[in-house]
Design a protein with these regions (language model features):
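Membrane-embedded alpha-helical bundles that constitute the cytochrome b-like, heme-associated redox core
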Residues: 1-187
């Protein structure tokens, strides 16, 4: 049963999930963009292997984060937000959760469709999710690539919204997700 009283700021665990996943997403984009520019060879394969490992790490963290979120209520949105702003904030968070699951899963399925292994930092290999299929690979690659741009856009929107709250609205939305800061409960 979730905690019924909303806190004034995010817990250290929620902050840890947020910032670790954010750092991994930035790393994922850097790895993917770097690998895209390379010809097929050892360097590209190493970058793609790391991309897959970090993707599976994001999937594991997303599961843990969702479980944490189900039992730990987040702070309420500021009272000064309009109905449309609250709806957009909630929709953005739901979309983030969906993408945190769908991006790694489509990447995993894409590798499975090519019968490429997905290992986790060379410690163990995940099983294939689907049978090899060139048409499935092409479809999953398109979906994965398209969703990566959606994730990029949503992340930029999320950052801009946090900065708007901090500098324009002058509320504590950003501070309550930052470690080592104090946020005031404002009415």
């Amino acid at each position: 049963m979730p905690n019924q009283t909303p806190p004034s700021r995010y817990s250290a665990v929620a902050q840890g999930f947020h910032w670790l996943i954010a750092a991994l997403i930035v790393t994922q984009f850097a790895l993917a963009w770097s690998a895209d520019d390379l010809p097929l060879g050892a360097r590209k394969l190493v970058l793609l292997a790391r991309h897959k490992s970090f993707g599976m790490t994001i999937l594991i963290l997303a599961v843990l984060r969702l479980l944490w979120r189900l039992f730990n209520r987040p702070p309420e949105l500021p009272q000064g937000m309009t109905g449309i702003e609250k709806m957009l904030a909630k929709a953005t968070h739901v979309l983030f959760y969906v993408l945190l699951f769908v991006m790694p899963l489509t990447g995993w399925m894409m590798s499975s469709a090519k019968n490429y292994s997905v290992s986790w930092f060379d410690q163990f290999t995940w099983p294939n999710l689907i049978s090899p299929s060139e048409s499935a690979f092409n479809l999953l690659r398109t979906v994965h690539d398209t969703l990566s741009w959606l994730l990029f856009a949503v992340a930029i929107l999320h950052i801009l919204a946090a900065l708007k709250h901090h500098f324009w609205n002058k509320d504590d939305v950003l501070k309550r997700m930052l470690p080592f800061t104090k946020s005031e409960k404002r009415s």
